[in-house]
Structure formats: C-alpha cells, structure tokens
Amino acid sequence: MTDAYIVSALRTPVGRKKGSLASMHPADLGAIPLKETFNRVSLDPALVEDVIYGCVDTVGPQAGDIARTCWLVAGLPDCVPGTTVDRQCGSSQQAVHFAAQAIMSGTSDIVIAGGVQNMNMIPISYAMIAGQQLGFENPFHDSPGWIDRYGKTEVSQFNSANMIAEKWDISREDMEIFAQSSHEKAISAIDNGLFEDEIVPVGEFLHDETPRRDTTLERMAELNPVIEGQIITAAVSSQNADGAASILILSLIHISEPTRPS
C-alpha cells in the first residue's frame, strides 16, 4: 500500500452570518482555493484524476455536483471529473479520507479534496425541508421502517449533542470553557499570522470573521438552552458560516525530490 501526501492545503477566510461572503455563489467561492492551488503548485491540472468536495444541503446553487461545478468555474480542464460527499458536519473531512484512500489503494495518484458551503445563501438543514412542497414534512416522513424503529421523535442535532453530553458526562460549564478556549486560540492564531499561508484572500477579505473577541464565560452562562431542559446553547454550537477549502493529495511517485518527505 502506498502513502498519500498532502502537498497543498488552501482555504478562503471564513465568513460569518450576513458577513463578507454571504452573497457569493458557492461555485465561485469553491473555485477560489482551486485556482490558487495551481498558482502555487507546478502541476498540470489536467492530470488530476478526481475532485471530491464535501457539502451539506446540496440544493439550489449547491446542487448539481458542486465539486465539479467549482472546478469548472475555476476555469480548470473539463476532462477532470468531480463528486460531492455529504456526511453532514464531517463532509469535507470525509472527502479528504476518500481522496487519501484512493491514493493509498493505488487506484489514483492525484486527487483534490475539500469542500464548500454558503450557509447564508442556503440555510442550515434546508435540504431536510426542501421536500415539503412535494408533501414530505422531512426525510423520514411516512417511512414505516423509520417510524417502527424511532417513532416520530424530532431528528435534531441539538438532541444528538445533548445525548452525547449525557453519555460522556460533559457539563454545560465544560463545553463553555472549551468554546471560550477555542475562540481565544483562533484569535491568537489570527493575530500572530498563523493562518496567512493557508488563506486565499477574497478581494479585501483576509481574515476569519467567526472567532468572537468579545465573548466571555459570563456571557455564555446567560444564554438560554436551544431546547428547554437541555444544556446546548448557541455559544457551544457551530456557527452559520461560509467558506471553501482545497487540498491537493498525491502519491509518492508524483512528489518531486525537493518536497519528498524524509
């Protein structure tokens, strides 16, 4: 089994709700790190064997295989295929795993993985309700098998998060301390330029908008839970955000001598 190597990892800054990327079409957003990849790496893009992007809520401007759409919008060769992965919040991570597995199995040598999402344009979980105009309240509506197993209890990320917290004895205070630390680390990394090599500016938009400089544990403690009686609040939940990333993964045979790992 061969090894897989990440030789380029680029991303846009992350835009907040109603922020700098809110009106950018997902295909144009996803094209940005793809274009820059080939500005920085000496590689013929026509040699790429697959483009695997993660994206949740693949409806509207994110439908129609957004991975390939981003590639084409970037002006890259139309002989290269693309596919889109939906593993919910782990979609882009799964795209990277699939790319690495393709290389490690020997079926591919050059693959791009990444992801794109504009949550301002396509709100979170919109795909879950998109079938309502066709008479489907949600993806599980009127499925006898689903109802036999789970009943009609609402399917919710917040319920799931609360179940995990209960199973592993994670308190609200534990989560808030972790969230506060996460914001502080992100802000420190921004202020010290640690993200500069990986971020591709979008016009004059240079830095992530999502880390909160003004948040405190005291402010977090004042928030009401999303679901009454539970402990999950907005402060410990992922934000609505927009962004894209592109990672170039190669087999050893395609890595030039100067960049070959020792």
Can you name each region flagged by the protein language model?
Residues I253-S262:
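Single conserved hydrophobic/aromatic residue that forms the stacking wall/gate
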Residues C55-D109, G151-Q157, D214-Q239:
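Conserved catalytic cysteine-centered active-site region
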Residues R11-N39, D57-G60, T83-H97, N120, ...:
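Active-site pocket-shaping loop/turn-to-helix segments
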Residues I110-M163:
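Flexible glycine-/small-residue-enriched beta->alpha junction loops
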Residues L10-T12, S23-I32, R40, D174-L252:
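N-terminal extracellular/periplasmic Venus flytrap/periplasmic-binding protein-like
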Residues R87-Q117, A165-L194, I247-L252:
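Active-site-proximal alpha-helical scaffold in enzymes
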Residues M1-A74, P81, C89, M163-R172, ...:
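Conserved active-site "lid/cap" helical segment
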